[in-house]
Curated annotation (Swiss-Prot):
It is an enzyme of class 3 (hydrolase). GO terms for biological process: protein quality control for misfolded or incompletely synthesized proteins; rescue of stalled ribosome. GO terms for molecular function: peptidyl-tRNA hydrolase activity; tRNA binding. Monomer. Keywords: Cytoplasm, Hydrolase, RNA-binding, tRNA-binding. Hydrolyzes ribosome-free peptidyl-tRNAs (with 1 or more amino acids incorporated), which drop off the ribosome during protein synthesis, or as a result of ribosome stalling. CDD domains: PTH. The record marks N11 as: Discriminates between blocked and unblocked aminoacyl-tRNA. This is Peptidyl-tRNA hydrolase. InterPro entries: Pept_tRNA_hydro, Pept_tRNA_hydro_CS, Pept_tRNA_hydro_sf. TRNA binds at Y16, F66, N68, N114. The keyword Cell inner membrane does not apply. The active site is at H21 (proton acceptor). It comes from Geotalea uraniireducens (strain Rf4).
Length: 191
């Protein structure tokens, strides 16, 4: 039985609950609901839960450190469970992908994402798997304000279907592996 640490990136607190930057938290909450793995235990500077799904042991983690310090929480969890970056799946928002699309990426840089920057610094490596949920770029205005703003009413309508599609992607990733999942899902419109 393989063990995977699945991390959803976001900011804690009700103020940020429906912001674009909390896409990782939203996916993890949906995964938690569908797998029955509750993410309520306070540990590793975050909220976590453990359970079995599709024959593997999953550790779900929502760092409660705010985005730019997420790496501390993830590093603590990896050390405690004696896991490596190869056992890590990180779900995060991505400005360079349109809303409604998702991409998988193995390794890479942080592309200006403060959560990924923190992870790479704390782990000493960016060689972890990323599930990149598209949020699109603002047509005009500040990127920081955009990622910290709520999804639009139109986006909120499609959000449940998008989150379910990403959970389906995670299920395939766990059962079928990266190459097959990438070929089926990369840049696929999930709405």
């Amino acid at each position: 039985m393989a063990v995977k640490l699945i991390v959803g990136l976001g900011n804690p607190g009700p103020k940020y609950q429906w912001t674009r930057h909390n896409a990782g938290f939203m996916v993890l909450d949906r995964l938690s609901h569908l797998t029955g793995i509750t993410v309520t235990r306070k540990n590793f500077s975050g909220l976590c839960g453990e359970g079995s799904w599709q024959g593997d042991r999953l550790i779900l983690l929502k760092p409660q450190t705010f985005m730019n310090l997420s790496g501390r929480s993830v590093a603590e969890a990896l050390r405690f469970h004696k896991l490596t970056v190869e056992d890590l799946i990180v779900i995060h928002d991505d400005l360079d992908i349109p809303f409604g699309r998702v991409k998988l990426k193995a390794g890479g840089g942080h592309a200006g994402h403060n959560g990924l920057r923190s992870l790479s610094q704390e782990l000493g490596s960016g060689a972890f798997l990323r599930v990149r949920m598209g949020i699109g770029r603002p047509l005009h205005g500040d990127v920081v304000n955009y990622v910290l703003s709520n999804f639009s009413p139109e986006e909120m309508i499609g959000l449940p279907r998008l989150l379910d599609g990403i959970v389906d992607l995670l299920e395939m990733l766990i059962t079928e592996g990266l190459p097959k999942t990438m070929s089926l899902y990369n840049n696929k419109e999930l709405l």
